[in-house]
């Protein structure tokens, strides 16, 4: 990322990191209203016993490699053997001139599928949740869309 884009990314991460859950009946500001009116609500409206991690750093030793990373947002649901998780990663990439939403989403999927596969594997090691019960999704700020990412661990 270059200067301006990096600064924008840090600002956006900071804004969304501050939000644990959005109350649909009482949004606190325009940002929360935008979440409620978009697909992002799946990541920010708490249902049942959901819990979340926000900007959670981790370190682990995997094979012969020391791995460090940071999850933007992980939402957990269920318990025991039914526990599952969704990893959400904020992306501030801009749509290119003339690029359709579908092309933009496909570009982001392709660009970040390796990163998201690493996050899925890491979360499984850290939590004991099997990889087949962990989903990976991108939250694209340019379109306020949720972009599912297939990882190599999925069937």
State the predicted function of each range.
Residues 90-94, 140, 153:
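A short beta-strand motif that forms part of the nucleic acid-binding face
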Residues 1-80, 112-121, 125, 137-147:
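Nuclease catalytic cores
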Residues 145-155:
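Short, low-complexity, polybasic intrinsically disordered segments
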Residues 90-108:
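Short beta-strand-loop-alpha-helix junction that forms the active-site gateway
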Residues 55, 88-89:
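Residue-level detector of conserved, well-ordered beta-strand and adjacent loop positions
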Residues 84-86:
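Structural motif
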Residues 132-134:
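Short glycine-/polar-rich loops that comprise or flank the Walker A/P-loop
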């Amino acid at each position: 990322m270059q200067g301006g884009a990096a600064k924008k990314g840090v600002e956006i991460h900071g804004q969304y990191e501050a939000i644990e859950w959005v109350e649909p009946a009482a949004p606190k500001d325009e940002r929360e209203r935008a979440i409620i009116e978009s697909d992002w609500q799946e990541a920010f409206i708490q249902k049942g016993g959901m819990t979340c991690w926000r900007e959670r750093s981790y370190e682990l030793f995997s094979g012969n490699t020391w791995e460090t990373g940071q999850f933007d947002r992980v939402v957990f649901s269920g318990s025991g053997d039914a526990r599952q998780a969704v990893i959400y990663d904020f992306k501030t990439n801009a749509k290119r001139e003339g690029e359709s939403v579908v092309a933009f989403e496909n570009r982001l999927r392709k660009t970040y599928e390796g990163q998201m596969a690493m996050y899925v594997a890491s979360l499984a090691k850290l939590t004991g949740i099997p990889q087949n019960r962990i989903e990976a999704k991108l939250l694209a700020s340019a379109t306020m869309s949720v972009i599912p990412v297939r990882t190599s661990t999925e069937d």
